[in-house]
Amino acid sequence: MSLGFIQNDMKMIQRTGTLNFGNVVAESNRHLLGDDWTSEFSDDPNEWRVQKADIVMGCPPCSGWSVWSGPANRGPDSKAHEHTVAFMKYAGRVKPRAIVFECVQQAYTQGRDVMVKYRDMVEQVSGKKYDLYHVKENNLQVGGFSYRPRYFWVAVESGLKFSAVTPEPKELPRIMDIIGDLAEMPQTWNKQKYTAPSPSKWVKHLRTKNGMVDGHIGKTNIHAQRIEEIFSIIGNDGWEGNGDTGGALKKAVDLNDGKFPQKWIDISPRVIRKNFKLGFSQPYRWKEDHWCNVLTGSALDHVIHPTQPRLITHRESARMQGLPDDWNIEESRNYSHLAAVWGKAVPVQAANWIGKALKDALDGNPQGEPAELIGDREYLIDSDKGFSRHYAKKQWYSSPMETSAK
């Protein structure tokens, strides 16, 4: 999320929080994030150093609202919200002109009252009044590569006008527009030359000036080995786009005289018991003529490349999140949570979009239609209204290789 704000000529001065997650990666990319910031993390929010700032921004865990969480861990009383509460209390101590965090849209649709209480919490700590804006957006609509509906909680000094431009796309990219030029490159942590001379217009600006890119390597764990075993039997063309692992595995077993591939033998009784129905979160193959889907923290274990017989790589994940190819990955190769970083991050384009809206507001030049007043100093900006999966698919993805709107 930080890079999108920095792209709007903002300066980061501090990274802090309850979770020291991903900071190793940020430290390796000071050439893009600036070199004037400090980082300090503590379970005790009272230890977070307060500095003068115009904006406090954050990305606390969404698990308290996410449909991926079980009912016992989801809702207004979820323990995961402790991180958001800590964020609010810290923001109140800083007393900035604006505060923003990103979450899934259920935080608004199911937890609007909680969102208002967060504003009240900031006001109580800071002694300042803030106007609350609920901002709904979709990463694909605002210039990103994935169909990713999300929610930005935005609080600005009371009376400060805030709005955001609702984009009207003329074209939208497909996944191979984003990662196609990386597909056939050898896998390595080290820097290597691009092998595809002509990237799509969607990512041309993301390629490095020196023609070298690092971090194009995936996992080699048991999950990756099992996927490779399936491909070794059914072939690359034997696994169709949107096809799940259970279906591909059954095809492999049938072609292998009823025998499970070697790496699958130990779990074969469970697979048979479930009739090859491996559940909602099993690996599946993305379609090459489709948009990028949402990356989760387990993407490198669960996303099978659209055209290559393998799981996706770190660099491909970074690309899909809008990060430039000079975003250093290799230096963080020993960071145990590196694979989870990509799916836990806010896409650069979505961060850039909300960052620009905040900068325009702070500069006294808000853009876009006025927000809808829905409560006491409470507003709604419903940017992705009507931008449904059905609408996007019909408008831009109904023909196999067509990317322009009808």
Could you describe each region identified by the protein language model?
Residues M57:
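N-terminal Rossmann-like NAD(P) cofactor-binding module of classical short-chain dehydrogenase/reductase
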Residues K11, R15, V85, R112-V116, ...:
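A structural signal for well-ordered alpha-helical segments within the folded catalytic domains
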Residues Q7-N8, F101-C103, G297:
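Short His-Asn-centered micro-motif
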Residues D36-A53, S63-F276:
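Class I S-adenosyl-L-methionine
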Residues M212-K406:
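C-terminal target-recognition/interaction regions appended to catalytic cores
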